[in-house]
Every structure is written in C-alpha cells, then in structure tokens.
C-alpha cells in the first residue's frame, strides 16, 4: 500500500475528530441546571473522541502501523476498550443520570487496565507466531463481548424510558430519543467492525480510518439536534420516573384490586372515561396520564392499570387511536380543512407525525382519505 493513501485518510479523519472532541468539551449550553446532565454526557463523548484522535495521531505522526503491526493492533484494541465504556456511559447517562457511580467507574477502569496489561504481555513476552496471533484474536473476542454487554445494558435503559413515555405521555416523546437506538446499533456495527478492521492487511487499512468519518459526523449532528429537545425530554423523563416510583408504592393496592375478575373501580372508571371521551378531552396537546387522572379524580396507577387491562395497550397508543378516529370524523365532516388544520385540531405534534400515525392506523394517508371524502 502507498503510505500516502493511509496518510490522506488520517488527514481527513483527524481534524474532524479534534474539532468534534473539543466542541463537545468546550461548547456552551443553556444556563439551566437541567442541562447539566446533557453537558456531562457530551463531555464524556468529547473525551472518547479525543482519545481516539490521540490514537490516530500516533498512527499519523509515528507511522506505527508500518513499524510494528502487532503493536498498532494491540494499541487500537486497548483504545477501543476504554472508548466502548466512554461511549456507552455517555449515551446511558442521557437515559439514567445516576448510571455512573464510583463503583461502576472503578470496575470498568480496572478492566481496561487489565486488558492493557494483557496486551502488553502479548506484545512483549509472547513469541511471534501462531500463539501470539491466537491470543490477539482472543483479546479481540473479549473486546467484542464487552461491547455487546455494554450495548445490552444501554438498550435496556432505552426501552425502559420508551415504556415510561408510552405509559405516561400522549405525545410521542420517544421520537426525540430514537437517535439513541439508531446510534447504538450503528456503534455496535462500527465498534465490532473496527475491532476486526484493525486486522486488515496494510493495503486495505485506510478503510478502517475512513469508516469512522460518517460515524462521528452523525454523532455530532445528533447531539446538536438533541439539545433543542433535551429540556422537554428530561422533564418528561423526570415526571415518568416519579410516576413509576408511585406505581411501586401502590403495588399492593393494585394487586389486591386485580385479584378480582372485574376490579371494583372498573365500572366507575368506565363511566368517567366515557364522559371524558364524549367531551373530546383527548385532543388537548401535551396530555399526560397524571393530568387525566386529576380530571377523572382517580389514582394514576389505577387508571394506567385500567387502560392496559381494558384496551390492552399503552396510554400513548390509546390516546393516539382516539385522536385518529377524531381526525377521521373531521375529514368526513369538513373536507375543506387542510391536513395541517386537522392535525392541530386532533392534538398531534406536527402534520408529518399525524400523517405517519394515520397511515399506520388507517392503511392510507389522510390526503387520500380527504380526497375520497370530497
């Protein structure tokens, strides 16, 4: 391989990573206490990116790949091990502000130190040949397993938050954090890929460098975009966590009620909900299950249990279904209304969100339905 191709690849990636890393560390955020967790997450990401930039710098300025391939591979694996932890911690912190603890931090740092020591032993003490190569692949396998373990933990936190949003919010707040799921799967593919691509022959190693460019650009843009919605998401998350804690406190009463074939509160609840539906109370934007429980003068936990038992769906899906049916009636009665008007009157966040949900529910777009009504 011509060293220039490899060098040009590093010239493309290194400045971008330095810019992203320092931006994540130093760029300001709104001066509100609620953004402290976002800033912490972004700074963790900045440290991870700068650590990878330092790795790239060693490759660029020292040309270690051409001097000692095994040393370059083991250095990469050790760097990735620490970065896996940093990336997963940065993302998980957005979902659980209490995720990073002293004990957890100490454990993962010790694991990284152990991994690095073993890498040094493999490089310096084991003879070159089949044994050294086998142990290097074993270390790479350990890295992949470690990454998958962190990924599983992150996805569990993500799905827990989505479930809380669906059970407590009528609006699709989860759409604002969907990028976390997308980025996680991309990170798994990229992380495992990097662990394998570092073993590529010299003539193809530039692929390892260039593959990182779109990955970090996407991460950078996601964090910039998420800043716009972070306060709304964090408030919803805090409300949802509080509601979940209330659920735990009310578990005994709920279990006692659910032992009956028809819980004692269902008949009264059904009457109250019917009156609320007849009054079109579900079209109010930003509706939460707590607000509905206050309107119905009932317990939030009982209301949530009633919705799940009676309709076999989450609070958000139930409200969405009611809003879609309301939108259908508007389309039939007032075909001259625009899609944007119908979306707003039905309580949806945006016309695009309304169109997507309408198509999922009705099997056609509201525009087609509107044309048919006309």
Where on the chain are the PLM-derived regions?
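Membrane-proximal linker segments that couple transmembrane helices to downstream signaling/catalytic modules
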Residues: 223-345, 357-360, 367-374
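Hydrophobic alpha-helical transmembrane segments and immediately flanking/interface helices
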Residues: 70-90, 199-223
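The DNA-contacting recognition helix of HTH DNA-binding domains
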Residues: 300, 350-352
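N-terminal low-complexity or simple alpha-helical regulatory segments
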Residues: 1-117, 131-134, 138
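Alpha-helical transmembrane segments and their membrane-interface junctions
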Residues: 57-71, 188-206
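Alpha-helical transmembrane segments and their immediate juxtamembrane interface regions
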Residues: 86-107, 213-239
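Alpha-helical transmembrane segments of multi-pass integral membrane proteins
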Residues: 34-54, 108-109, 134-197, 207-216
